[in-house]
Amino acid sequence: MTPESRDTTDLSPRGTQEMEGIVVVKVEEEDEEDHFQKQRNKVESSPQVLSRSTTMNERALLSSYLVAYRVAKEKMAHTAAEKIILPACMDMVRTIFDDKSADKLRTIPLSDNTISRRICTIAKHLEAMLITRLQSGIDFAIQLDESTDIASCPTLLVYVRYVWQDDFVEDLLCCLNLNSHITGLDLFTELENCIVGQYKLNWKHCKGISSDGAANMTGKHSRLTEKLLEATHNNALWNHCFIHREALVSKEISPSLMDVLKKAVKIVNFIKGSSLNSRLLEILCSEIGVNHTHLLFHTEVRWLSQGKVLSRVYELRNEIYIFLIEKQSHLANIFENDIWVTKLAYLSDIFGILNELNLKIQGKNNDIFQYLEHILGFQKTLLFWQARLKSNRPSYYMFPTLLQHIEENIINEDCLKEIKLEILLHLTSLSQTFNYYFPEEKFESLKENIWMKDPFAFQNPASIIKLNLEPEEENELLQLSSSFTLKNYYKTLSLSAFWIKIKDEFPLLSRKSISLLLPFTTTYLCELGFSILTRLKTKKRNRLNSAPDMRVALSSCVPDWKELMNRQAHPSH
């Protein structure tokens, strides 16, 4: 076909189809151009491209930024760049290439003060990227928690979750170093000054707040959560951290079982409290040939420590008994009590099971439906176990350590009855406490919107009527559940990514789903952040201003190195 024939307009139906085809191709080409332009911008701002198109001084500056970025990401001391990284790089370059190439690395500024300034610059850059996104008017949710660092300085961490491009993004919003003896109202003032005053964000876009149930967050005198909800005009949903609630449930224990736990901890403290005792037990365990040779400490602030401590004490019970006899300790008498050892076996099982549940509700980017399934499933499991023990033929298969202990040891019927009653009382108490901390009425809205979890489960049109949706929403769900293409997307994408992907085609259902999935259900990210803080701020670095390092170490944004270099090349006057 000649160019002239392609330009000729055909008014026939066939020609109309060809014209429509041309328009479609043009739109696709525009989309492709936009896609490739984004990829080009991304490549142009990458360190690899920048290093090829700049002078030696600019390359040295970029290298300084890249090293500082890695130092912060790895939570290293700022002196590591000059004392470890640079000498190591020079050794490698000198070995593989020559001295002249290695000497070029000396032009890279890597002193501790320089690295500190670079990290501060990168942190401000990442903060600006995040705030620019949030200032666009998108909805967001926050989780917050407060703790103290090695220097006894209160620190407030706030994480944010928001919709960006094709999924939820979670990022550190702010790390605030606070004054001592700060109250809940003071915390709110600090947050208000930062989020509204400094970042210019509007609380009306905050759709979710998550915190633990500590007094400084929810106490009647602190009123932090209450003030935050007032600031959002009560449009935000407050979630008490699921992990914290589950940890509170595990603390409900009868006096008899608490006595077993306390004695186990006392034995551990007797051995671990002395380095000599620890070494002697290690030697004894090594000679006997057991898998583990050390006991573990228990601490109240570590959620998973109880189960691990009890399991290790039970596993090494014979070795500990021999050791205590050799030390002529009265604690050896504890292991001669069969009922105590049997209860120890049960506690190691039940706390191990609670630990597994705790781990299931940890992690990033988990939706509230997943948490609800884990909690409701465990509540049903507790009821089933109670029914199993009350039956004419009770079984202990759900507690493998206890079952093995009963099978391997001769335990009289009276002891078994006492232990069975103790277990039943504990399981009943756990069920009641779960119902208190996870009341069913709190999850009614989730059950009413169960279609969000799987919109393709309603193949029968009549089943959609029972969902109490608006007519427009019913029509969208009817069309959505009939799409095989979108069903394939549903299978491959996360739940949040799926609803974001179809927001233009099904706006009502998508908006409703995103608003329910957006709020945090735990403060896991804050706990993870405090763990990072303990690595950054040590006894030797107790005067460190941790906020910039925390920002770079935890940020989900990737620095735009091209923008950073341009800013450095054109400083403000």
Curated annotation (Swiss-Prot):
Name of the protein this chain belongs to: Protein FAM200A
Predominant location category: membrane
Region Disordered: start-end pairs: 1-51
Highest taxon, organism lineage: Eukaryota
SUPFAM superfamilies, per database record: Ribonuclease H-like (SSF53098)
Record topology, Cytoplasmic segments: 534-573
Topology in the lipid bilayer: Single-pass membrane protein
Family note: Belongs to the FAM200 family.
InterPro entries reported in the protein's UniProt record: RNaseH-like_sf
Cellular component per GO, a single term: membrane
Keywords, sorted A to Z: Membrane, Transmembrane, Transmembrane helix
Keyword Hydrolase: no
Origin species: Macaca fascicularis
